[in-house]
Structure formats: C-alpha cells, structure tokens
Amino acid sequence: MHLVDDNGWRIEIKKYPLLTEIGASRVERPGKLFPERRNQRQGEPTVEKGFYTQDDIREIVAYAAARRIEVIPEIEMPAHSNAALAAYPLLACPVVDKFIGVLPGLGGNHADIIYCAGNDSVFTFLQNIIDEVVALFPSKYIHLGGDEARKTHWKVCPLCQARMKKEGLKNEEDLQGYFMARMSNYVKSKGREVMGWDELTNTKIPDGAVIFGWQGYGQAALK
C-alpha cells in the first residue's frame, strides 16, 4: 500500500499532525498532464487533499484479512519525501534554499529534495512513524522504498558529509546504504522484515531485505 510520495502523504500519523494537515494537500492543476504540472508557489492555496485516517486503515486491513489478503505498507525514504518535508522542512538538508511544497507532478529538480542523512532528527522522525505503522498493519513486512534518491544535496550538505566521514563511507551511495540499514535495523527490532526497491543493491543490502525489481527487467533484484 503506497502511502507516501512527493505528491502527498496519505496516512494519519498521530505524533506528526502536519503530515496530513500540510502534506496531504496540493495545488490543483486542471487539464495538465502529470509531467506538465507546475510546482506549487509559496502561499498558493492547496485544494486537492485526502488521506486515510487510522480508523480507515484498520477497516482496510480487516476487510483484506477477511479475504486472506495481506496489506503491506510502504513508507518511502530517503526520497519521494517532498510531502513530508513540506510539513517538516527542517528534516531536509540545510543547503536546501527553496520553498518545499507538495509536488503536483514530477517536480523537476524539486524532486532532489530528500531527507537529510546527516540529521539524527530524521531517524527519530521516521522511527516514530514506523511505530505507528507497525501498530496498524499486522503484515510481516514493511516496505521502505529506497528508489530514485538523487544525491544532489547530500553532496554539498555539511551534515551528510560529516556523517560520511564519521562512518567511513566512500560516497553518497554508501550513505544511502547506511540510511537504509539504520532504518531496516529499526524495523527488524519491531519484529518485522524489510522490503525495498532494487536501488538497495547499489551498495550493501540490508540483511534479509526482500528486493523489488523495477529497473532492467528486475535483474538487480534477481542477483
């Protein structure tokens, strides 16, 4: 169940109400194809909105379970996070100098804005979200995304570069490996297993992760 993306945060998280107050709303671009939709400007009203309440999620999970269907939640990280960062912009790299809005389309270089891997508050934030997600979904698995993480800001972010130096990481790809491993370990500490997209194979794969292939006919996942 794809619950979050650049274009909207779609699950109620009690600890972080701005995720749905801000992150679940976006500007309207009537008549425009998805790739052609201009990004939100600061102060522009957001009229397209919607999200699942926690009661909605419980109802969906129960309906599916009655039909022997397992609902696996996906919480994207470190990319596809514009909606979350529109709500909590301090979780982006401090070098981001543009307005972060919920993207109505592909977003262009605004899609470069992802969670800061050098900021410990990011991990606390995501762990708290995982806590609420685990309480709602009985599935054995939690999907953590991991795809299409552009490293534009990580390369110039002092916090990310300090993290790389501290952890002995060779490059920003390894920094994503650190990010995903840290979050995977947290998910596993909750008794769940991790799923992710095939970009996780670009560096050390989190132990036991189930890889979903979407590039190159799934060859990375196959390996």
Residue map of PLM features:
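Substrate-binding cleft of carbohydrate-active enzyme catalytic domains
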Residues: 1-192
